[in-house]
Amino acid sequence: LDRVKQYLQEAGVAYCEMGGVQPNPIDGKVYEGIQLCRREQVDMMLPVGGGSVIDTAKAIAAGALYDGDFWDFFIGRAKVEKALKVAVVLTIPAAGSEGSGNTVITKTETLQKLGLCAPEHLRPVFSIMNPELTYTLPAYQTACGIADMMAHIMERYFTNTPDVEISDRLCEGTLTAIIKEAYRVKQQPDNYAA
């Protein structure tokens, strides 16, 4: 985070911060972020972190330019017609949200965990995915990322879709590479090639 702030300052880019996003992001942080964006006249979101941080930023991006309750988008009461631009600095492996127009948020009052798909407005305009930003992650988080990558690949692999031989071979090759590199990254977390 300090590195990103330094780059923004050097480039003369004004910014404001909001922290405290938790895994399985909740609506309270989205409401807080919407208020912050409106008060500070934010024109772009730059979440620095993993999937929960990115999902929260996407929900804020949609809600900041909407006159109603952002939750309207999640329950189908409204459609996202405009949103703040979202760019991403990914600091955890295998989030997935850095390349999609989807977001998942939990409403604490009802414990509803719902997704929103609005790729034309919420897909990040760019994502910085530098492996060096994962070097300081705890080994557990790296292992979770590896398991998550494998799970997503296996979702595609164990399908009943016919005639996907090439896709199956790509999945097998990718899984083989992930398994091989997982051992290296465990021993050398700062190995860029792993």
Describe each model-derived feature in a short phrase:
Residues 4, 57-60, 178:
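Hydrophobic packing residues within well-ordered alpha-helices of enzyme cores
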Residues 28-129:
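Glycine/threonine-rich beta-strand-loop-alpha-helix active-site module
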Residues 102-194:
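Carboxylate- and glycine-rich phosphate/diphosphate-binding segment that chelates Mg2+/Mn2+
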Residues 23-30, 69-77, 176-194:
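A short, flexible low-complexity segment enriched in Lys/Arg and Gly/Pro that occurs
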Residues 21, 90, 132:
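Residues at the C-termini of beta-strands that transition into short coil/loop
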Residues 1-44:
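ATP/NTP phosphate-donor binding region
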